[in-house]
């Protein structure tokens, strides 16, 4: 299992558009990918799950992946988060 912590810096947090991009990125991989915030974990391949967390600016989140391509999944998600200005 791979895990990585992120600090959300975007003014709007993880709202609909970046959430969609994160879900699309996670969905490219066979690994189980989860987003954890405030003790609640959701499937990062589910837009409804991601939106239900209400991740705002300044939030600390953990993304984990488990499976054959877990490292690639985490790296791709980190790249998406940085590219979209969600984290540094």
From Swiss-Prot:
Active site: 15
Annotated GO CC locations: cytoplasm
Compartment(s): Cytoplasm
InterPro entries noted in UniProt: HPr (IPR050399), HPr-like (IPR000032), HPr-like_sf (IPR035895), PTS_HPr_His_P_site (IPR001020), PTS_HPr_Ser_P_site (IPR002114)
Modified sites of kind Phosphoserine: 46
Residues covered by the HPr domain: 1-88
Gene3D superfamilies hit by this protein: HPr-like (3.30.1340.10)
SUPFAM superfamilies per UniProt: HPr-like
Coiled-coil residues: none
Classification via PROSITE patterns: PTS_HPR_DOM (PS51350), PTS_HPR_HIS (PS00369), PTS_HPR_SER (PS00589)
The entry's keywords: Cytoplasm, Phosphoprotein, Phosphotransferase system, Sugar transport, Transcription, Transcription regulation, Transport
Any Pfam family the entry gives: PTS-HPr
Function statement: General (non sugar-specific) component of the phosphoenolpyruvate-dependent sugar phosphotransferase system (sugar PTS). This major carbohydrate active-transport system catalyzes the phosphorylation of incoming sugar substrates concomitantly with their translocation across the cell membrane. The phosphoryl group from phosphoenolpyruvate (PEP) is transferred to the phosphoryl carrier protein HPr by enzyme I. Phospho-HPr then transfers it to the PTS EIIA domain. P-Ser-HPr interacts with the catabolite control protein A (CcpA), forming a complex that binds to DNA at the catabolite response elements cre, operator sites preceding a large number of catabolite-regulated genes. Thus, P-Ser-HPr is a corepressor in carbon catabolite repression (CCR), a mechanism that allows bacteria to coordinate and optimize the utilization of available carbon sources. P-Ser-HPr also plays a role in inducer exclusion, in which it probably interacts with several non-PTS permeases and inhibits their transport activity.
The protein, known as: Phosphocarrier protein HPr
